[in-house]
Amino acid sequence: MRRLSTLLCAAMLMLTAGTPAAHAAAPWFASSVGAATQVISVVGVGGSSAKMDVYQRTGAGWQPIGAGIPAFIGANGMAPQTHDGQMKTPMGVFTLDFAFGTEPNPGGGLPYVQVGPDHWWDGDMKSPTYNTMQVCKKEQCRFNTSLSAGTENLDIPQYRHAVVMGVNKARVPGNGGAFFVHSTDGGPTAGCVAIDDGTLVGIMRWLRPGALIAISK
């Protein structure tokens, strides 16, 4: 994957520098992303596998700057509407709100939080902070920190680097939470999108506020 990451970074640099590009056919998500200029496309290819394409909008239209990136999705595939515990990746267009990871900030335009053992993603459906990042000592947290309750401790290898997807922003209990683009461990996810860490870092350095992710079968 190192060569793919290098090519992705090179393509991003060329577009940033204003290199002329040929007009390309509009991608599948074009009518659903408003005025966004950066979109990560994820399309399922069967089971828990998908391909990711990275697009930049330029004066010549949408330009793919990273294509055919192998990705893992939920162990049970995708669904238009997901619920806690389904192990499915939500379909639709979502914001990319901020980034986090156990590693130091690799750079980029999104806010970044370096996480440790006191960082959690609250999945407790009875908690007023459901579907948000929380920082607390386990014994002092005001929500159920158990994995069986849906809460995740963020100090794990898969979250070496991650970007938060704006799924269920209304934080409706049961409608799912903790959906990220994160580093892969080589297998299906609980509903997130996972890719090679080096490639993810290249994408994170390119991302700016207003970027979107579009997910479809």
Per-region residue spans from a language model:
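Active-site nucleophilic cysteine motif
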Residues: 189-195
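Cell wall/extracellular polymer interaction/catalysis modules
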Residues: 24-189, 200-212, 217
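Secretory targeting and sorting signals
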Residues: 1-24
